[in-house]
Swiss-Prot record:
InterPro entries: TRAMP_AT-DNA-binding (IPR051644), Znf_CCHC (IPR001878), Znf_CCHC_sf (IPR036875). The lineage of its organism: Eukaryota, Metazoa, Chordata, Craniata, Vertebrata. It comes from Bos taurus. It comes from the Eukaryota. Residues 402-429, 440-458, 504-514 have a biased composition (Basic and acidic residues). Residues 490-503 have a biased composition (Basic residues). A zinc finger (CCHC-type) spans 241-258, 263-280, 304-321, 348-365. Keywords: Isopeptide bond, Metal-binding, Nucleus, Repeat, Ubl conjugation, Zinc, Zinc-finger. It is found in: Nucleus, Nucleolus. This is Zinc finger CCHC domain-containing protein 7. Component of a nucleolar TRAMP-like complex, an ATP-dependent exosome regulatory complex consisting of a helicase (MTREX), an oligadenylate polymerase (TENT4B or TENT4A), and a substrate specific RNA-binding factor (ZCCHC7 or ZCCHC8). Several TRAMP-like complexes exist with specific compositions and are associated with nuclear, or nucleolar RNA exosomes.
């Protein structure tokens, strides 16, 4: 019942295709060989099909055609010279009489109850020298009966091998076009039967229509050119690509003309050394900075067990759950707790083995990285402010013990941070921070320096006071007589070598020197009136003579 009442599929095919017998398989193999030997590659099939449909519609405007849509194609195969396709899209005609492989496809009208007349040899006797497959569309006559427009493909097979070899060379039929042939050196100059592209493969690279990705067009990445002068041009067109080596636009890091940068350290981000030679590396056991005399006093990590998450490799004060509990917190203070406890998801996968049913920290197979122990991704409980305060106090006590024993070295400073610290800042803030950031050993040295500075200042003040007393004992200028109306007394002039004179700014000094000149003029006027000071009078006479 599977084959419509026929015993075998061969009998069903014989009845379907109206063949007398299916014992001769040579005809089918020859047809298959000839069909596969003439393979045509199409590029723009949509445009070609639209053109054919448009031409079919134009030819159909002259007459009305009647066709049955549900009628199946009937293929007639026989040992005679004609093979017909009735009510189908194509008619294929094969013959073994002529000399070459030829192919023609024609659109013509096929009547419902007519047979094709004439031998296929007579149809192509005048076209033996053609090189390509031709497609001719013939318009039907207005007096013909109603039918359908179909295509006819006629393939003629040669009988002699010599004619086949000579004509195939003239028709550009290479050995690669035939099934079962090996690759030939002459296959470079191949003219493909490509619809929509009439260019050969071996044409220049500028003439080949290659397809370029849209991402490559947007990036506009240029290959590295052979000449060196092109790489140094500052007006290159490709400006939207940034180099990771020199941070300039226009090229990639592999095409950069500058030498490659040295790889930075993953611990301190400085260049010139790697992780194992870094001065800021830390101990994996105690997490303290390592030095030449460092000795780790902590227990091995596989002997540590956390009282908080019950995992191996750390203690409760270093549990990753401490920072994981802040996943909902956005303000300073204790961590925010969720209103409803989050349940575990139904889909559980392992990041270590990739299997379903368990998490990565529960996996019993070998780990990909053995330097650290796995941790739990869940939060068992949230800390309140009292527990946070207790943990901070424990950490401070531990830091004091390390400082007391000398196990905690000085803080490592990067070179760029040290250069930033050397910039001028406010004297008060720098002095306060300088006092607070010093260690006890350095405080003793600073105290000695401050004591010596204070002693020097005291000696300067003592010398200034002695000079002031000498001026009072031996006056060199006239004394100003105080008037009864003024209660203010003039202060004695300070000597020029006083220490406070150098500490004042320059503008104040200039203004005060100007005032001193005015006071001297007034004193000279007063001295002329009173003849008490004879020494000044003698000096004036000498100056006037000179």
């Amino acid at each position: 019942m599977m084959f419509g009442g026929y015993e075998t599929i061969e009998a069903y095919e014989d009845e379907l295709y109206r063949e007398e017998s299916s014992s001769e398989l040579s005809v089918d193999s020859e047809v298959e060989f000839q069909l596969y030997s003439q393979v045509h590659y199409a590029q723009d099939l949509d445009n070609v099909i639209r053109e054919e449909e448009h031409e079919d519609r134009n030819s159909g405007n002259s007459e009305s055609f009647s066709s049955k849509p549900n009628q199946k194609n009937l293929i007639v195969l026989s040992d005679s010279e004609v093979i017909q396709l009735s009510d189908g899209s194509e008619v294929i005609t094969l013959s073994d009489e002529d000399s070459i492989y030829r192919c023609e496809r024609k659109n013509f009208r096929v009547h419902a109850k007519e047979k094709t007349q004439g031998s296929p040899a007579s149809l192509h006797s005048n076209d033996l020298a053609d090189k390509k497959c031709k497609r001719d569309i013939e318009k039907s006559k207005p007096g013909e009966r109603s039918g359908t427009i179909q295509e006819v493909m006629i393939i003629e097979v040669s009988s002699s091998e010599e004619e086949e070899s000579t004509i195939s060379e003239s028709d550009n039929v290479e050995s690669w076009m035939l099934l079962g042939c090996e690759v030939d050196d002459k296959d470079d100059d191949i003219l493909l039967n490509i619809v929509g592209c009439e260019k050969s493969v071996n044409e220049g690279e500028d003439d080949v229509n290659w397809f370029i990705s849209d991402k490559d067009i947007e990036a506009q990445i240029g290959n590295k050119r052979s000449s060196g002068r092109w790489t140094h041009r500052y007006y290159t067109a490709n400006k939207n690509v940034t180099c990771r080596n020199c941070d300039k636009c226009g090229h990639l890091s592999k095409n950069c003309p500058f030498p490659q940068k040295v790889r930075p350290c993953c611990l301190c981000s400085e260049r010139g050394h790697l992780q194992y030679a870094c001065p800021a590396r830390f101990c994996l056991g105690c997490s303290l900075p390592m030095s030449s005399t460092h000795r780790c006093l902590e227990r091995a990590s596989w002997r540590k067990r956390c009282d908080r998450c019950d995992m191996i490799g750390h203690y409760a004060d270093a549990c990753p759950e401490i920072w994981r509990q802040y996943h909902l917190t956005t303000k300073p203070g204790p961590p925010k707790k969720p209103k409803t406890p989050s349940g575990q998801s139904t889909l559980v996968y392992c990041y270590n083995c990739g299997q379903e049913g368990h998490y990565g920290h529960e996996c019993t197979e070998r780990r990909m990285f053995n330097q650290t122990f796995p941790t739990s991704p869940f939060i068992y409980y949230y800390d309140d402010k009292y527990k946070i305060r207790e943990r901070d106090q424990r950490i401070k006590r531990k830091v004091k013990e390390l400082q007391k024993n000398g196990d905690l070295p000085r803080k490592f400073k990067r070179p760029h941070m040290e250069a930033a610290d050397k910039r001028p800042r406010d004297i008060r803030t720098s002095h306060a921070s300088w006092k607070n950031n010093r260690w006890p050993q350095e405080k003793k040295e600073t105290q000695k320096e401050t004591m010596s500075r204070n002693m020097r200042e005291r000696e300067k003040h003592r010398k200034a006071a002695r000079c002031h007393e000498d001026d009072e004992d031996f006056p060199r200028g006239p004394r100003v007589h105080s008037t009864p109306g003024t209660s203010k007394t003039q202060k004695p002039h300070k000597p020029f070598h006083h220490s406070s004179h150098y500490l004042k700014p320059r503008e104040d000094r200039l203004s005060k020197e100007g005032k001193r000149g005015k006071h001297k003029k007034k004193e000279s006027c007063v001295g002329e009136d009173s003849n008490d000071n004879l020494f000044l009078i003698k000096q004036r006479k000498k100056k006037s003579k000179l």
